[in-house]
């Protein structure tokens, strides 16, 4: 800037600044190659639902093809192991779909035989009562994929006469409290429910200012918007890998209306859980 004799301030042209702006504009200009890479990446990140048995893609949302009255969703390794041991072991379940996901944290597997250490998102219904559905999701669903997941699973106009139960875990350091987290007895359960969920939850409600994250939050928000009765049981733990004590912290939920009729033999299920943990330890041991 420069000042005239009359005190007027005028701008002097600066070629350096202009050149920098031009270089910045050139850098921001998208090339056809950039657009193609972006299209391919977006295509790769699309959430797809398909039948592994037939390798066919589902053309409609999962719940349009398989209407349900109860939908139980386990998200994360410990919640998945809980359903595998205590619910899926108590009845004959049939796979009805599988989500294919690709993102920075997850590559879902297409194999028919899944282990607890693999990333997968599989849907089942109960053979004796197909209106009861279950989802085991051990993989990470990125923020830009959550809406796609909801659309592919629930559809654009979901049924309101169903009840959704969500099980998941968070590390105890995410729990906000006036107490020291070291004084908390972990693991422990907290619940969060939609306005239309009228049953009393089997643990205390999650207090403010605590919030839920990722896919569990997306599912609960979706149910709240569409007035679907839904409850989220959130287990706070200090062990995020597959852990027997964390898995058993979900046991109070077995008394809920959604799960009570699905569980037959808890002692036998506990033994199956212990075998599952042993198998996982063997698979995780680099020396075997």
From Swiss-Prot:
It comes from the Eukaryota. The modification Phosphoserine is found at residue 180. The modification Phosphothreonine is found at residues 18, 54. The modification N-acetylalanine is found at residue 2. InterPro entries: Proteasome_assmbl_chp_1 (IPR016565). Residues 28-38 have a biased composition (Basic and acidic residues). It is found in: Cytoplasm; Endoplasmic reticulum. GO terms for molecular function: proteasome binding. The modification N6-acetyllysine is found at residue 264. Degraded by the proteasome upon completion of 20S proteasome maturation. Keywords: Acetylation, Chaperone, Cytoplasm, Endoplasmic reticulum, Phosphoprotein. Residues 12-38 are annotated as: Disordered. GO terms for cellular component: cytoplasm; endoplasmic reticulum. GO terms for biological process: chaperone-mediated protein complex assembly; proteasome core complex assembly. Forms a heterodimer with PSMG2. The PSMG1-PSMG2 heterodimer interacts directly with the PSMA5 and PSMA7 proteasome alpha subunits. Chaperone protein which promotes assembly of the 20S proteasome as part of a heterodimer with PSMG2. The PSMG1-PSMG2 heterodimer binds to the PSMA5 and PSMA7 proteasome subunits, promotes assembly of the proteasome alpha subunits into the heteroheptameric alpha ring and prevents alpha ring dimerization. Belongs to the PSMG1 family. This is Proteasome assembly chaperone 1. The gene is PSMG1.
